[in-house]
Amino acid sequence: MAQQVLGCTSRPIRVSLHRCSVITTSDTIRRKNLRFVRNPRLSFSLQSSTRNYRLPSINCSTVNGAVAETAEYYEGEGDNVSLAEKIRQCIDFLRTILPGGSWWSFSDEVDGRFIAKPVTVWRALSRMWELVAEDRWVIFAAFSTLIVAALSEITIPHFLTASIFSAQSGDIAVFHRNVKLLVTLCVTSGICSGIRGCFFGIANMILVKRMRETLYSTLLFQDISFFDSQTVGDLTSRLGSDCQQVSRVIGNDLNMIFRNVLQGTGALIYLLILSWPLGLCTLVICCILAAVMFVYGMYQKKTAKLIQEITASANEVAQETYSLMRTVRVYGTEKQEFKRYNHWLQRLADISLRQSAAYGIWNWSFNTLYHATQIIAVLVGGLSILAGQITAEQLTKFLLYSEWLIYATWWVGDNLSSLMQSVGASEKVFQMMDLKPSDQFISKGTRLQRLTGHIEFVDVSFSYPSRDEVAVVQNVNISVHPGEVVAIVGLSGSGKSTLVNLLLQLYEPTSGQILLDGVPLKELDVKWLRQRIGYVGQEPKLFRTDISSNIKYGCDRNISQEDIISAAKQAYAHDFITALPNGYNTIVDDDLLSGGQKQRIAIARAILRDPRILILDEATSALDAESEHNVKGVLRSIGNDSATKRSVIVIAHRLSTIQAADRIVAMDSGRVVEMGSHKELLSKDGLYARLTKRQNDAVL
């Protein structure tokens, strides 16, 4: 019953086949008795075995989105399998590995979170041309030298053969002329090939740079909800390996394809002039080779997409593990994390195995057809020489040019398969590049002449796009007057930080609206608004740069070092900063600063902005008691500054932090349940009073 529920309907049977074990599962990671499978399909087990095993039962469970099968193997029971059954299993296996068999299928290897639409080769090339169009002279120079080099190279066999036979005939004048032309062609080809390689390398650099610039810029201006559905490892994989894979199109693939198409066309014309019957035979063989090449190229395109997805998933696991290394080390889960990473590596190896097998078939096809061309040329050409229809010199030229044509076809096919891989990798990159920026960055909002800081939440409700069935905030009505300090408290998950995210316009309310000085928030210029808001989060993030740059981060006005030091002193960060080896020039590192020190730098950053609206989301949670007391005094002075009249919103679990607030809003399950001063809420004996009592009891 468990197998039917989890979709594990097939029972893998392992048989001995020339010391190569075969298992009837496709996506299999063999770690002792643990295997991850998506669907029943044949794949190789890389472990050799001389014994037969039979799998009587399988217990299924879900591990990281895959199905884990814990199998029990028993020795000796393989002898009960009849010879006819073994032969039938071997025949079934051989049938699956034939072209078109199930072993070659990738139908459900990857469940992508962001499904990309297929991109045609022409569409991909036109997109790449758009990226390099500003430097089209580099492309033109590259292709111009390519044409000269290709034409020079294709004429070399003619003069090489003519030189040999003119020397044999004793015609010295013709021999000297042919040698001079041969030297000229070789020198011209060498010079143009070098210039061609240089210009194509420059074009490759331009393409990958522009592609990464465009993709990075596009991602920067997406809604926050987009990043909620994507992982950092996946996005960095698009910027890194995927863009690099696509950039090979101009510098390598198109370069070699055009070069060999020119040379192959020249060789074919020359062959038809020499002997049209032999030329047609060679052309037929090249057409067969081209058909095989097309099928192989399409297969390579599909494998490239899967390798792209699996590589991104592997990068995601590695990045997550490295970023949480302290947690991994404390809980001793190194082996589990290795198994998670190895899961994706095994899937990558499984696809690469089939990719290598496909390449082997393509290579076998080429060599077979290549040697067939030689046999036909020698057979038919020899008979033609005996009949007096052609000369030995003509046959020699024919053999050289037929070989050139076949190899040109092979190189076109090889690079075309690489081109198809690059096009497959480009699908997700181009689809991300086509994403429209957030409406906040497109529309030009209103900029108020004077901002007083009057904030109103009017019947605001909100659900996160990733789980829109759950209402995080419901019908919230809160008003914050200029110069007022309003604290928001409640249990975890009650919607406190969500209100801050809505005020910062990281998300739009599902219903209701937020007013700032009577103007709907969505009508205001986002950049202008955020420049007037100071925000300190409960887990402040600092950039890997010096402390001074972190403090002045986001300020659009000229900031002096004295301003930075003044803000740091107000945040009680100056003393520990000056104690660091390089003071304010110290590069921030996670191991260098404690959580409290990071929070004080974040508070200094907010103070330096001189904001009209100050938002503190658990801004003192990582501070010690003395630092918290000092910072609270600074924050009170900031909020009560008569010259600026800042509006301050404080979110805190430490209720001692917000007792002096003008008003306290208590929230529960996304709703406002109480509102008033500290004394008023204590007298109501409601949620706030219960929270206060619990914290006091915890202290005692």
Curated annotation (Swiss-Prot):
InterPro entries linked to this entry: AAA+_ATPase, ABC1_TM_dom, ABC1_TM_sf, ABC_transporter-like_ATP-bd, ABC_transporter-like_CS, P-loop_NTPase, Type_1_exporter
UniProt-listed SUPFAM superfamilies: ABC transporter transmembrane region, P-loop containing nucleoside triphosphate hydrolases
A single MF term (Gene Ontology): ATP binding
Domain ABC transporter: residue ranges: 455-694
Pfam families per UniProt: ABC_membrane (PF00664), ABC_tran (PF00005)
GO cellular component, one term: chloroplast membrane
Protein's recorded name: ABC transporter B family member 26, chloroplastic
